[in-house]
């Protein structure tokens, strides 16, 4: 049985004061025991959040990590070993904003994925299509290619210690949301692609949906058989809203 997971991606939001307030709100939440809860603050605030959530069953992750496992001469980057030392357990790899705006390629993301795993940092691989790709009927082709990039480089068993988040780019921060059935169809295809390589890995990997998930639509999305939780953007910046989404996953 796959454990539900709700992960909050804070993106490039926060000041010391607002992060302290949000962290306090999260620490006061009554979270369902059966749900794995994680937050991904900006790198500058990782230590502050870890300290603020001490004793709380909330995992802290990073939004990005370097292409090499160890510290070294790579200006502006943070190495997986440094993130692990700080207390991170997870890292987002390939979020659409990094693919689309920063220009990260599958090759770069493969290196980041491997570097993270080499230091015991669990990757959350983000995959998804743009509106143009969906309208052209290329959703499964695009998602399949992004998934295959990792499988071809490292084998499907790389996903035995990873999470996959499907995030249709057109639904991120737009207020648009894939219908539960649209999301389920893609999640089923992802699990099917993995199962063609290794049924055991496919059955165990957590598949999250990301794309304007809110308390109002979370229960319906999470009720789908291949949706194991959510990667939450804007709604994760409100502790009460995030708590409601976590409870929806617990139900």
Curated annotation (Swiss-Prot):
Disulfide bonds: none annotated. Its EC number is 5.3.1.1. It catalyses: D-glyceraldehyde 3-phosphate = dihydroxyacetone phosphate. Substrate binds at residues 9-11, 173, 212, 233-234. GO terms for biological process: gluconeogenesis; glyceraldehyde-3-phosphate biosynthetic process; glycerol catabolic process; glycolytic process. PROSITE patterns: TIM_1, TIM_2. The keyword Isomerase applies. Gene3D superfamilies: Aldolase class I (3.20.20.70). It holds the Pfam family TIM. GO terms for cellular component: cytosol. Pathway: Carbohydrate biosynthesis; gluconeogenesis; Carbohydrate degradation; glycolysis; D-glyceraldehyde 3-phosphate from glycerone phosphate: step 1/1. Involved in the gluconeogenesis. Catalyzes stereospecifically the conversion of dihydroxyacetone phosphate (DHAP) to D-glyceraldehyde-3-phosphate (G3P). This is Triosephosphate isomerase.
């Amino acid at each position: 049985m796959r454990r539900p997971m709700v992960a909050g991606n804070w993106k490039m939001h926060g000041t010391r004061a607002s992060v302290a307030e949000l962290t306090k709100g999260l620490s006061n939440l009554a979270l369902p025991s059966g749900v794995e809860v994680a937050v991904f603050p900006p790198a500058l605030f990782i230590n502050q959040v870890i300290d603020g959530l001490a004793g709380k069953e909330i995992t802290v992750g990073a939004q990005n990590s370097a292409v090499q496992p160890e510290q070294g001469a790579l200006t502006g980057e943070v190495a997986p070993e440094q993130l692990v030392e700080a207390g991170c357990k997870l890292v987002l790899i390939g979020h659409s904003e990094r693919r689309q705006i920063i220009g990260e390629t599958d090759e770069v993301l493969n290196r980041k994925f491997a570097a993270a795993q080499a230091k015991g940092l669990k990757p959350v691989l983000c995959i998804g299509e743009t509106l143009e790709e969906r309208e052209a009927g290329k959703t499964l082709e695009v998602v399949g290619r992004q998934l295959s990039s990792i499988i071809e480089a490292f084998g499907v068993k790389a996903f035995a210690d990873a999470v996959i988040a499907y995030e249709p780019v057109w639904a991120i921060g737009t207020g648009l949301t894939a219908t539960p059935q649209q999301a389920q169809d893609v999640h089923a295809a992802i699990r099917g692609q993995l199962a063609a390589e290794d049924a055991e890995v496919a059955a165990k990997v957590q598949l999250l949906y990301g794309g304007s998930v809110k308390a109002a639509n979370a229960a319906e999305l999470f009720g789908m058989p291949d949706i194991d939780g959510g990667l939450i953007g804007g709604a994760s910046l409100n502790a009460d809203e995030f708590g409601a989404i976590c409870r929806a996953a617990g139900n």
